[in-house]
Swiss-Prot record:
PANTHER family: 5-OXOPROLINASE SUBUNIT A, UNCHARACTERIZED PROTEIN YBGL-RELATED. It is an enzyme of class 3 (hydrolase). This is 5-oxoprolinase subunit A. It catalyses: 5-oxo-L-proline + ATP + 2 H2O = L-glutamate + ADP + phosphate + H(+). Forms a complex composed of PxpA, PxpB and PxpC. InterPro entries: Glyco_hydro/deAcase_b/a-brl, LamB/YcsF/PxpA-like. Belongs to the LamB/PxpA family. Coiled coil: none annotated.
Length: 253
């Protein structure tokens, strides 16, 4: 039976600001990436998100980003590899404390936004992230963009497991990278098209780029975005579609 992980970014609320549909999406995913306070989230939200994830038996991962609350961590920053290492190690440690306090065990780390995209093409950034994971806990998995040589090489260097990731509602360029969110066609807004793309990736191992070329994608986890207007409806549709197609949904080991 084909097996796939469904992951989602949660815990992005902070202070008086509510973001996303965390409670409604949790039943339809197998792993979550929790914001750690730099691009979103705060200590109370981190604790609450961890506790809810454990109640739903969902795997928990840290979602470290750039210290850019105003830009939601989606803006590139001119930072050194050592700064990236510090940012990631700090955020892993913060979330891990809440996970341990709740009696759980953290499973993975997935960089957020601009940090993720920079790491996918910049070996030094990817190396810094992998090193931070290794020094924190070498048993943690690294979620990274499928086919990214930077992620692949960094994971191999530090002997950590890379879980290659694809995106349900994002378009792809010919080189296998995601279309920038600054482009109008970055997101697939039609649910039927997004469902078709996901099934194509999981069952056939490829995706059609924005130019129409087939791009090989051997993903072990699929990312759903939880902050869109119809995020819960979309998550449930993918979940049910996988069930109907005999695809098992579970977190990677």
């Amino acid at each position: 039976m084909t097996t796939i992980d469904l992951n989602c970014d949660l815990g992005e609320s902070f202070g008086a600001y509510k973001m996303g549909n965390d409670d409604e999406i949790l039943p339809f995913v197998s792993s979550i990436n929790v914001a750690c306070g730099f691009h979103a989230g705060d200590p109370s939200v981190m604790r609450q998100t961890v506790e809810k994830a454990l109640q739903h038996n969902v795997a928990i991962g840290a979602h470290p980003g750039f210290p850019d609350l105003i830009g939601f961590g989606r803006r590139n920053m001119n930072v050194s590899a050592s700064e990236v290492y510090d940012y990631v190690l700090y955020q892993i440690g913060a979330l891990d404390a809440f996970v341990k306090a709740a009696g759980g065990k953290m499973q993975h780390v997935k960089p957020h936004g601009a940090l993720y995209n920079m790491a996918a093409t910049n070996p030094e950034i990817a190396d810094a992230i992998a090193k931070a994971i290794y020094h924190s806990n070498p048993n943690l998995l690294l979620y990274g963009l499928a086919n990214s040589e930077a992620f692949i090489q960094a994971a191999e260097k530090y002997n950590i497991t890379l879980v290659q990731e694809a995106f349900a509602d994002r378009t792809y360029k010919q080189d296998g990278t995601l279309t920038s969110r600054t482009e109008e066609n970055a997101l697939i807004k039609n649910e039927d098209e997004a469902i078709k793309q996901v099934l194509q990736m999981v069952k056939e191992g490829y995706v059609n780029s924005v130019n129409g070329e087939k791009v090989e994608v051997q993903a072990k986890t699929i990312c759903l975005h939880g902050d869109s207007e119809k995020a819960v409806q979309f998550a449930e549709r993918i979940y049910r579609t996988f069930e109907l197609n005999g695809i098992s949904i579970c977190a990677p080991k």
